[in-house]
Design a protein with these regions (language model features):
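Non-globular, low-confidence helical/coil segments that flank catalytic cores
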Residues: 2-340
Length: 340
């Protein structure tokens, strides 16, 4: 020994300690994964339960719930699927460019018959896949707003749709206030359109679905003029979940309307970095002030909400690595704790 101390000795020991911690964390991680695998195979605890614990799911998937609402990620458009018992209702079917997403969701849910196809209003981003869907699936009823000479569109998409509806001899129901029906054990109430509007957005079907004591409100692209009329009508707009009108645009979701609905959660259906600025920051600010939880298909992907008639559970789509990132973050946090 020359009596000289190694100036890097402490650093070496510290590095060694960190390496040991990393080894321990990796070992814990592997034991964790192995344990879940064993429990999954034994049917005791599954990866699906773990995903649900973290509030994430692998896109659209069937649930054990008697009532489930799926808000499908169709980029800049709308498509929701409601499964209530054995009944299925589809609300809007996006643009034709999202046909694969719509087909995939219906296939995953093993849908071969649609009891009600609701087309809130005849804009391309709501009816784009409608003709294809009614030609490929058994559709019992189509719910549409009654249009007039001041608002009937002249687009080829709409004209082909009308021809295909007639060709398939599908029962068409003209949506109007006070029209109610059941899907499974859920009650559907139509609140609008209230009158004829030149603006097609305001011809949107506004409807509330009630399952037990849980309520879901859909309004297509209905704007502030319709929202104001609904509030003044005195109809019960309260809902646990509000599908924001017009993709979260500032043309909808007024403060007065939001206070009437009193939602716990708001759903935005829009594409990422869309050219319309959806959802509007002003709308998000209003929701934030009212302590409303916001979920967006642009951020969260497919959104699934289940209800047992009393409580609702919100699940969002996971990417293949999402759950592992969460677990990795937990491991990093554990590492930081151990260092102190």
């Amino acid at each position: 020994m020359d009596g000289k101390r190694n100036p890097n000795g402490y650093k070496d020991r510290l590095l060694s300690t960190r390496q040991k911690i990393i080894v321990v964390l990796v070992a814990i991680f592997l034991v964790f994964v192995g344990t879940i695998e064993v429990l999954d195979r034994l049917g005791v605890y599954s990866w699906e339960q773990l995903y649900i614990k973290f509030g994430v799911i692998d896109g659209v998937s069937k649930t054990d719930s008697n009532f489930t609402v799926y808000y499908i990620n169709v980029d800049q458009g709308d498509c929701s699927i409601i499964v209530s018992g054995d009944d299925v209702m589809v609300i809007d079917v996006a643009t034709i460019s999202a046909l694969n997403e719509v087909r995939s969701a219906l296939k995953t849910l093993e849908v071969d018959k649609i009891d009600y196809l609701v087309l809130t209003h005849p804009h391309e981003d709501h009816i784009g896949c409608a003709s294809t869907i009614i030609n490929e699936y058994e559709v019992s009823n189509i719910l549409m707003p009654k249009l007039s000479s001041i608002n009937i569109p002249t687009t080829s998409t709409y004209e082909i749709l009308i021809n295909d509806i007639a060709k398939n001899n599908i029962n068409v129901i003209q949506a109007k206030p006070d029209y109610n029906f059941m899907i499974g054990e859920a009650k559907v109430e139509i609140f609008a359109p209230l009158q004829q509007y030149e603006e097609l957005n305001n011809m949107s079907i506004v409807m509330k679905i009630t399952f037990g004591s849980t309520k879901f409100l859909f309004q297509g692209d209905a704007e502030s003029e319709v929202e104001q009329a609904l509030v003044e009508s005195g109809v019960d707009l309260t809902a646990d979940v509000l599908k924001l009108g017009h993709h979260g645009s500032n043309t909808s979701s007024t403060n007065k309307y939001l206070k009437a609905v009193q939602p716990k959660y708001a759903i935005v259906s829009c594409g990422p970095d869309n050219p319309y600025g959806h959802p509007s920051q002003k709308v998000l600010d209003r929701l934030n002030k009212l302590n409303v939880g916001v979920y967006s298909t642009a951020i969260h992907g497919d959104i699934t909400i289940t209800s047992d008639g009393k409580n609702i559970t919100v699940l969002t789509e996971k990417t293949g690595w999402f759950i592992w990132i969460k677990i990795f973050i937990l491991l990093i946090e554990l590492n930081q704790i151990l260092q102190f």
